[in-house]
Amino acid sequence: MAKIADSIDSAQADSVENVESYSTETPESAAPAAPRPVLSVPGAAVGRRKEAIARVRLVPGAGAVTVNGRAFADYFPNKLHQQLITDPFKVLDLVGSYDVIARITGGGPSGQAGALRLAIARALNEIDRENNRPTLKKAGFLTRDARVTERKKAGLKKARKASQFSKR
């Protein structure tokens, strides 16, 4: 059994050497990029979604999120909303780098979460535009979601719902 394990290990080592020898990258370009220093500049921005408006300040800190004076998990108990809001930090590898202080008015939980995400992304973009903007733009975090509720029309029950039509 030990013989088989040794032969497998030697075969794996040979294949790794072959793969490394065929690489087109130079050792300098293949090396991981140096970690970016966290900027100690505060950022502020406004985000809107549906009827919700979020005003955000980002301050260098430990990653605490305060929404309307309450803890993040208390204000947004839904894990999906929590994930949606923290996505800009995850994409930029800045989790735990900034404290978020947010004031949100109007709308429901989903609209407020979307507004907060847009505001955080805009604030991160403001802090370090050269490094953050391409990543945030590619992920779609800087795009304002323009979908809003359609207005109710006269003569209809809702925006498009009409009463049942009778031919005779």
Swiss-Prot record:
Name of this protein: Small ribosomal subunit protein uS9
Family: Belongs to the universal ribosomal protein uS9 family.
One GO cellular component, as annotated: cytoplasm
Residue ranges, compositional bias (Low complexity): 23-37
Pfam families with a match to the protein in the record: Ribosomal_S9
InterPro entries recorded: Ribosomal_Su5_D2-typ_SF, Ribosomal_uS9, Ribosomal_uS9_bac/plastid, Ribosomal_uS9_CS, Ribsml_uS5_D2-typ_fold_subgr
Organism: Leifsonia xyli subsp. xyli (strain CTCB07)
Compositional bias per record (Polar residues), positions renumbered to this chain: 9-22
One Gene Ontology MF term: structural constituent of ribosome
Region: Disordered, residue numbers: 1-38
Keywords (A to Z) from UniProt: Ribonucleoprotein, Ribosomal protein
